[in-house]
Amino acid sequence: MRLSRAFAWPLLCSIATTVKAPFATAPSDCGGHYTDEYGRIFNYAGPKTECVWIIELNPGEIVTVAIPDLKGFACGKEYVEVLDGPPGSESLDRICKAFSTFYYSSSNIITIKYSREPSHPPTFFEIYYFVDAWSTH
């Protein structure tokens, strides 16, 4: 589920200022399986062209993904995809441009995939994830 931008921007600002490090991921990670209640995913600048991050919270919890800004992405050469569940699940969105966008999982798992063409250098991005305290099953 995608949240409207009018509501998302103030919420993201409040989250970004109240949720501070330590975050679960590091800029050099190309994928991984994370179980922390919140974290931040950075772009990967190494030779791999596809990275997959699986975020798995406790059963009954909903994962919220916040993408503050994707700018500078070359659409057609790189994108971020948000999957509603483990790899292979339904895609919530495949994006190459975004500003203040939120996604919610329908279960306790969400997958973030970054893909780029081998000849294209990676563009900086950061994505936040956290447990949605208001939307548990």
From Swiss-Prot:
<dbReference type="InterPro" id="IPR035914">
    <property type="entry name" value="Sperma_CUB_dom_sf"/>
</dbReference>
<keyword id="KW-0732">Signal</keyword>
<dbReference type="Pfam" id="PF00431">
    <property type="entry name" value="CUB"/>
</dbReference>
<feature type="disulfide bond">
    <location>
        <begin position="75"/>
        <end position="96"/>
    </location>
</feature>
<keyword id="KW-1015">Disulfide bond</keyword>
<feature type="disulfide bond">
    <location>
        <begin position="30"/>
        <end position="51"/>
    </location>
</feature>
<protein>
    <recommendedName>
        <fullName>CUB domain-containing protein</fullName>
    </recommendedName>
</protein>
<dbReference type="InterPro" id="IPR000859">
    <property type="entry name" value="CUB_dom"/>
</dbReference>
<feature type="signal peptide">
    <location>
        <begin position="1"/>
        <end position="21"/>
    </location>
</feature>
<feature type="domain" description="CUB">
    <location>
        <begin position="30"/>
        <end position="132"/>
    </location>
</feature>
